Amino acid sequence: RTIRQMGDFDVICLQEVAVNFPGLPGSRGEDQVAELSAGLPGHTVIYGAATDVPDGRGGRSQFGNAIFSRLPVGQAWRHLLPWPADPDVPSMQRVLVEAVVTADVGALRVMTTHLEYYSLRQREIQVDAIRHLHAEACAMSGRAPLAEEQGGAFEVFPRPAEAILCGDMNFPATAPARSQILAPF
């Protein structure tokens, strides 16, 4: 309801989306992906769970990010971000969800993530990983598909260099990590 009150969006990027996770503050264990999908008819959902653990009752509890798109969605990826050990702070696995959407201006990659909060070291490594993923996508955008990549699991779909990164970066605008993620290649 809140999203609809804010406006009529073609693409919505969300973080901290839970499925069957009653242990989270404010959660009843609901399937937030299903509830959001029901409230956003006509949108394709791309969900990426960073955390996927047993719920203790024979099911699974998941926590991650989601992209909801009213625009046509091509290929989608769910990239687990690095999670190196940092014994001095609590931390959790993080994910970047990426989808190619077709807008009036052409194909565009939309990415959403939620970087580590407590560990500066992990967050900096995650920023490096996102930059690496973007560089990889830019390289793929200029590559012509091979004949063997037509149809089936090897099919190469358009993956444009143009991208928008959304999310909870867990750093202020003045942080070095912001300059790091925005630095030109």
What are these regions (language model features)?
Residues 1-11, 28, 44, 48-185:
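Active-site regions of metal-assisted phosphoester/phosphodiester hydrolases
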